[in-house]
Amino acid sequence: MLLTPTELERLTLYTAAELSRKRRSKGLRLNFPEASALIADEILEGAREGRSVAELIGFGSTILNTDDVMPGVADLLPVLQVEGTFPDGTKLVTVHQPIRPGQLPLAVMPTPGEILAPDGDIHLNGDRPTATLRAINTGDRPVQIGSHYHFFEVNKALDFPRERAFGMHLDIPAGTAVRFEPGELREVQLVQFGGTGDIHGFSGLTNGNLHDPACKLAALERARAQFFKGA
């Protein structure tokens, strides 16, 4: 038996659809691949029987409803498209909202990707020590500082009391930044790093634990030796 790639795909779809019918007959709710395969197979069979495209577009939304599928499947399948062979040629059948509401209330079904958050506001780093200080960019180029950069080790042209910033980063949402234009003075809010307190990299001033007094003294000495303003 010689089969074209399209015919092989049709057999694969039929196999998936038969599995869907078997599971549906057991009372199981269908997942996304099962629901898609079943609807597509019914449409292709309708085309083989000689039904029109317009008829199959309407028929495609009557095969399954939300009672037949797992929660969220209907939201994942807003449109179903399948190419079928009709008596007058190959045509694309597009069914919008192929899975219509069933008898069960939709309110009990969660939306895919929905965030179920507790009541109240979210407080960033609410349980960590903070500090507020003023910093000025004494350089001739802009300085941009990311949310989790060790503020003690930022650009040496930024002038502020660096000792107060040891072990701290900007108290802003992760992934955001604060930009200092040349000569700009800004007040910033800092918050202490969490976790174990080990700080490595950045400008190479710390490379130790922020809770270690000896590490802090050594970092200050390196900052002064390398002419970091405010150290």
Curated annotation (Swiss-Prot):
GO molecular function: nickel cation binding; urease activity
Catalytic activity field: urea + 2 H2O + H(+) = hydrogencarbonate + 2 NH4(+)
Renumbered residue ranges of the record's region Urease gamma: 1-101
Lineage: Bacteria, Pseudomonadati, Pseudomonadota, Gammaproteobacteria, Pseudomonadales
One Pfam assignment: Urease_beta
Keyword Hydrolase (UniProt): yes
Subunit structure: Heterohexamer of 3 UreC (alpha) and 3 UreAB (gamma/beta) subunits.
UniProt entry tagged with the keyword Membrane: no
Subcellular locations according to the entry: Cytoplasm
A Gene Ontology BP annotation from the UniProt entry: urea catabolic process
Major location category of this protein: cytoplasm
Region (Urease beta): 102-231
Record-stated family: In the N-terminal section; belongs to the urease gamma subunit family.
Protein name according to UniProt: Urease subunit gamma/beta
Example of a GO cellular component annotation carried by this entry: urease complex
Record's keyword terms, sorted: Cytoplasm, Hydrolase
Pathway where this protein functions: Nitrogen metabolism; urea degradation; CO(2) and NH(3) from urea (urease route): step 1/1
Assigned EC number: 3.5.1.5
HAMAP family linked: Urease_beta, Urease_beta_gamma
Top EC class for this record: hydrolase
Transmembrane segments: none
